[in-house]
Structure formats: structure tokens, C-alpha cells
């Protein structure tokens, strides 16, 4: 049996959400709350998901570049004269995409929540 590539990589619940656009949605969500940078986003996602969705730099930074190229976020170097943290803010198009992705993912999130609650209730109920 092979070992998964990382937390959530082959998890049927988290893996499905990843494919459906959960990471872009989370980045856009946090960017809508205020300026953010890559490491901050990775920490917030890890905290929010209690480690179920671990994001590494090899995933985060290409995603940030792609979202910026699509005009969904705008990046600005903290110190333009030298390479430092790049802070991102959401654009109007990014807000619209966040709303679209949230509406698209809502049924999947509700289904997963219901499944987990059903499993918990079944396993924790008296025999």
C-alpha cells in the first residue's frame, strides 16, 4: 500500500473539495478580509481546517500567481527595492469569483458535513 503524498492528497472528502476549487476559494475568502501573503494564507488554511487541508509552498505560490494573472487578486511587494513578502488584495473580479465558487461548493460542503455527522452519531450512539 502506498503512502499518500500529503494530508488530504488522497482523502476522498478533502480531495474532492480540492478538485472543486476549495483552495482558490479559501485564498479569495481570506484576501477579501484584508491584505495577506503566502505563508499567512497557508497558516490560516491549516488552522481553519485543523490540518485536514495542508498547503505547501509548491501549491500556494503557483496558485497565487495564477489568481493574480487572472486578475482576481493584486500583489504588491512589501519592500519593492528588495524581494520580501508579497501582499495580496482581492479585486472586484475576485469578489465575484469568490461568490461563484462559494455557491458552487456549498452543496458539497453540506453533503460532507451531513455525512460526518451521520458517522459520528452512528458510532457514538449506544449499542
Q: What residues fall within each predicted segment?
A:
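N-terminal helix-turn-helix DNA-binding core of bacterial DNA-binding proteins
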Residues: 14-59
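Beta-hairpin "wing" of winged helix-turn-helix
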Residues: 68-84, 89
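Amphipathic alpha-helical dimerization/coiled-coil segments
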Residues: 96-127
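Basic, amphipathic "hinge/linker" alpha-helix immediately C-terminal to the N-terminal HTH DNA-binding motif
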Residues: 82-102
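Short, Lys/Arg-enriched N-terminal segment that forms or immediately precedes the first helix
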Residues: 1-16
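Short, hydrophobic-biased segments on the C-terminal half of alpha helices
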Residues: 61-65
Amino acid at each position: 500500500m502506498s503512502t499518500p503524498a500529503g494530508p488530504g492528497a488522497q482523502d476522498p472528502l478533502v480531495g474532492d473539495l480540492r478538485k472543486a476549487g476549495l483552495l482558490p476559494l479559501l485564498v479569495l475568502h481570506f484576501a477579501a478580509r484584508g491584505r495577506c501573503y503566502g505563508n499567512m494564507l497557508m497558516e490560516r488554511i491549516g488552522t481553519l481546517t485543523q490540518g485536514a487541508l495542508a498547503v505547501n509552498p509548491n501549491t500556494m505560490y503557483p496558485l497565487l500567481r495564477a489568481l493574480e494573472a487572472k486578475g482576481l487578486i493584486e500583489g504588491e511587494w512589501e519592500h519593492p527595492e528588495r524581494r520580501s513578502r508579497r501582499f495580496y488584495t482581492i479585486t472586484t473580479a475576485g469578489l465575484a469569483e469568490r461568490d461563484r465558487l462559494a455557491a458552487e461548493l456549498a452543496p458539497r460542503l453540506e453533503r460532507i458535513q451531513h455525512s460526518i455527522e451521520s458517522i459520528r452519531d452512528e458510532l457514538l450512539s449506544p449499542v
